[in-house]
Amino acid sequence: MTDDRDKTNEDPEKIIEADFNPEDPDDADIAEDAKEGLVVATDVLPSTLPIIPLRPRPAFPGILTPMVFTGEKHVALAKRAVDTPSKMMGLVLAKEVDEPDSLENLHRFGVVGRVMKVLHTDDDSIHLLVNCLERFSIRELTESEEGLFARVDYHYATELSVNPELKAYSMAIITTLKELVQINPLYSEEIKMFLNRQSMDDPGRLTDFAANLTSGDGQLLQEILETIDVRNRIDKVLVLLKKELEVSRLQTKISKQIEQKVSAQQREFFLREQLKAIKKELGLEKEGKVSEIEKYQKRLKNLTLSEEAQKTIDEEIEKLRLIEPSSPEYNVSRNYLDWLTILPWGKFSKDNYNIERARRVLDRDHYGLKDVKDRILEFIAVGMLKGDISGSILCLVGPPGVGKTSIGKSIAAALNRTFYRFSLGGMRDEAEIKGHRRTYIGAMPGRFIQAMKSAGTANPVLMLDEIDKVGASFQGDPASALLEVLDPEQNSSFRDHYLDVPFDLSNVLFVATANQLDTIPAPLLDRMEIIRLAGYILEEKLEIARRYLIPKALENHGLKKGQVTIRKDALRAIIDGYAREAGVRNLENRIKKIMRHAAMEFSQGRTDKITVSKKDVAAILGKPIFTEEEVFEDVPGVVTGLAWTSMGGATLQIEATAMPSRNKGFKQTGQLGKVMVESSDIAYSYVMAHLEEYGADPEFFDKHFVHLHVPAGATPKDGPSAGVTMATALLSMITGKPVIKKLGMTGELTLTGKVLPIGGVKEKIIAVKRIGLTTVILPEANRKDFEELPDHLRENLSVHFAGDYRDVYQVAFG
């Protein structure tokens, strides 16, 4: 059985309270009969009762309880009780709501009830109005095919002499009930019905009524039902009523807050509507649609539109006039017009082609990078002669942290143009570039049209960051969509899917950035002018730290100039031990950590000035990440190669060894990529074919198994430039001769012994200087690259250029 106060638990066979209306004549007669005592405690009650399990709360004596019986078993039991002369049944609370009916799942106290009214329905359920009479305890409980039956002992309500204490407690219950009625009027009808049937001078009946009135937990109510002593029962009911009172107060408070909020919103709505009507009558405000159209027409006066765009906007405005504002199509049309009229059609910022000013801006924002700055100044000079720099698409390629993005900002500042940047990294949807068609819900233009809106001019500098990291998926290939945008012959009439009218992007200066070119599709790469940023050498990093990074870090950490001094030897230690990458991002992070350390010292009053020297670096920054690169000298079969990664230059110690074996063979280890494995195979074949020429045993490979290893084994490696180094390691191992001291080499080797050019000469020379090598072998074709390096990189180096491996051999083995 459930009632309106608790309907959270449902059971396939259950009994719930039905509607009982005291205004109904039949129901009123029943109530009157109960009041007149047609069923009273002195009636003879049967000693054996059919038991109906109740869920989720018990019934109480003296209460008229409407019930609905569902489920074949419960309906049969109810009908059997109705058909008996006494029309009585035992109502007992089940222990567990979700458990089926059983002997173990029943409490041992219940209420006997007499059926007062029966109503049959078409849904195989039966509605009863039951007058609950007296408590009983179960003496014996049995189960048969017909259901549960119990022999019971009744606990009749006895007339008590109402002493002052009981009367006081009864008045406390009545007072609490009155408070409940004042807070929640829903209780008033039930209290009125009770007063019509019972006397307030009966404390027992009063406590039962009060307990039944609450929404307490079923097990707690069962405990009250089982309390025979009226005085103890009153204590428990009073506690329950106080809780009910607090809940009712809280519910009332919440209801009032909600009503006040709703009322305030309604009041504000009505006032706004009245204000709108008053303004409309005074001519101070026009209808929303009219004002929207006037807004678009006002925008159009300041734009220079193409013929197609003008026609499209005019047609869309006429369409908007005919659409009701409540229509979903109205918002679609309005958003479309918003985009069309907010774009900078024909709006240009005036370019500044002053070369000296551009040079000052570039020098102010960046240290070094002379070749890059010269290329940008040349680019601006050409624009000055032509009168515009339309159709230009630059691609800045270099390691992370070398200033690619900031160079784009400097270009915009030098030209007096608006700068806008967005990242292409991880973009996998072609609609991100060309927009979504307006038929889709939530459609919007692509990133380029959004950028033009944000820039506010038709000739901004748009930076396409991380263009080498564009992806592809089933939603399309953004790199292919970029072909139209970055083609000077096509982007003058770029057609976004959302706008569906051509927009001129030919006056935009596109500046793309990338860490590498390998992942950029060839057609896209062909449309861009490549400018390489090789990275910074140690001396440049020192100067960048002194001029830019340290002053910026001081300001960002609330420190004054002179409070923190980082000596040059400390900066060198930081660069060598913590920030060897080509850029300065890690160097900046380490300087920030020093500033945070200083801020902590100052805030705790330990000192007011800090000077950081080389010996202090490890204490502040922790153990160095990079250790000194060890060069193995006088060891046959070990040669130092030069490598180039996206993080800058590095050295590789290539090792070769051989084991006497009847089964000749060759294997490589060290996580080598496909290209590097091919280079090792070429080196192996070349050495095998020229053993006699280099004074080695021509049958060496027939009698040995050869192993080539490139540490560190956990780091993946690839590229063709280690070919000459691998061949030299093999020859050194076979002949037993070590190479000369402090030697590094790089170059791609062919099967015929030709040495082909490689990339990253500057980065590799930086690595050479860092570990202290003095002799370097480079491909002859890279002579020009080496000669373009700054003097401080070339000095104190003995550089040999090789066009054939024989040149390498002569230098390596003296």
UniProtKB/Swiss-Prot annotation:
Residues 633-814 form the Lon proteolytic domain. Residues 1-17 have a biased composition (Basic and acidic residues). ATP binds at G398, P399, P400, G401, V402, G403, K404, T405. Its EC number is 3.4.21.53. Induction: By heat shock. It comes from the Bacteria. It is found in: Cytoplasm. InterPro entries: AAA+_ATPase (IPR003593), ATPase_AAA_core (IPR003959), Lon_bac (IPR027543), Lon_bac/euk-typ (IPR004815), Lon_lid (IPR054594), Lon_proteolytic (IPR008269), Lon_Prtase (IPR027065), Lon_prtase_N (IPR003111). This is Lon protease 1. It comes from Syntrophotalea carbinolica (strain DSM 2380 / NBRC 103641 / GraBd1).
